[in-house]
């Protein structure tokens, strides 16, 4: 009996630890980079803007969020934000480049090519009551041709490939 309880405690602890690593939390503010990476895992990308570094933590295709964590010149966490929001999506405009999109939304792991080499589509899933996704269509020159919100079919919010 005692072994079963011990095993249950270990399993529940591991489950809690895996949930804690999905998103940043305010206790990370002021912590160093080593502590951040221990809590969140390795960032997908790192960019430098002005006096701070921006670390991208992309949680797709399984997750619905992308977090940017900002570090100061001493590699300490200044702040964090979840960037897959309608305000961010609405700032994406035709003519922008893929790199500009990544600076605003982070990279996506859900991409599809268009027939006859007409470009590609990036697909961002995000948390919302309508089960919408945000799609960005790029030209072969890697600039935005169009964007759209798409409601996923079916009763559950789950990934449906772009056809």
List PLM regions with ranges.
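N-terminal amphipathic/basic helix or basic patch
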Residues: 9-10, 31
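A structural connector/turn signal
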Residues: 22-23, 87
